UniProtKB/Swiss-Prot annotation:
Recorded GO MF terms: magnesium ion binding; orotate phosphoribosyltransferase activity
Keyword tRNA processing: no
Entry superkingdom: Bacteria
Catalysed reaction equations from the record: orotidine 5'-phosphate + diphosphate = orotate + 5-phospho-alpha-D-ribose 1-diphosphate
Pathway: Pyrimidine metabolism; UMP biosynthesis via de novo pathway; UMP from orotate: step 1/2
Protein name according to UniProt: Orotate phosphoribosyltransferase
Taxon lineage: Bacteria, Bacillati, Bacillota, Clostridia, Eubacteriales
Cofactor(s) required for function per UniProt: Mg(2+)
Keyword field contains Mitochondrion: no
CDD domains cross-referenced by the UniProt entry: PRTases_typeI (cd06223)
Family in the record: Belongs to the purine/pyrimidine phosphoribosyltransferase family. PyrE subfamily.
Enzyme class name: transferase
Gene Ontology cellular-component annotations: cytoplasm
Length: 224
């Protein structure tokens, strides 16, 4: 496993973003782990988050994009920090774009924030976590309405590797529907493998009991 992936897993633990216990997802599933990206709160945390995304983007995509798009709301600061990291780390100077949930009736009344989308633009979407793919299904029509725009990929922080609308993962379903390449900084398989019986800040995060619960969860909800 690449060093940046290991660092990112520990970073999520330190920020309280990745936790293990008893949770219920938006889709009603009882899950033994939870990813709450709202716990990235400080400037230094957001800076590091953007750098991890930038590393994943550099590892999985060529420089064949000129817009980084973050779906509202969590994707707004994410798209900003990712574009800054791409510039700082790799000298890749691209624009950010996000959408509004509500259209303003004064001032700038457009639905987009940041760069406008024009014919010929190549868009890379950044999202926090995609379980069902709902936000992307809502975002794609907004992007396509702006003109002849090509969405070249989707990058998320953690691939939960769960069933989407069918037996396949939400990411695979999105790839098949829209024809773009998706990737994650880490997958839950990588997370579990790295954290199993490993101490982080003096505490074992995934012991035998937690590992058993995760395995049982994926027997029921894991993507085929």
């Amino acid at each position: 496993m690449e060093a940046y992936k290991k660092e990112f897993i520990e970073f999520m633990i330190e920020c309280g973003v990745l936790t293990f216990g008893d949770f219920v997802t938006k889709s009603g599933r009882n899950t033994p782990f939870f990813v709450n990206t709202g716990n990235y709160k400080t400037g230094s945390q957001l800076k590091r988050l953007g750098e991890y995304y930038a590393e994943a983007i550099k590892a999985n995509y060529k420089d064949d994009y000129n817009i980084v798009f973050g779906p509202a709301y969590k994707g707004i600061p994410l798209s900003v920090t990712v574009t800054m990291a791409l510039s700082d780390k790799y000298g890749i100077d691209v624009s950010y774009c996000s959408n509004r949930k509500e259209i303003k009736d004064h001032g700038d009344t457009g639905i987009l924030l940041g760069s406008k989308l024009n014919d010929g633009d190549k868009v890379l979407i950044v999202e926090d976590v995609t379980t069902s793919g709902k936000s992307i299904y809502e975002t794609m029509p907004i992007i396509k309405e702006q003109g002849n725009v090509d969405v070249v990929g989707l990058v998320i922080s953690v691939n939960r590797m769960e069933k989407g609308q069918g037996e396949k993962s939400a990411l695979v379903e999105l790839e098949e529907k829209y024809g773009f390449k998706s990737c994650a900084i880490v997958t839950m398989t990588e997370v579990v493998k790295y954290l199993y019986n490993k101490e982080v800040n003096g505490k074992v995060i995934i012991n035998d009991e937690v590992k058993t619960r995760i395995d049982e969860y994926y027997k029921e909800y894991g993507a085929k």
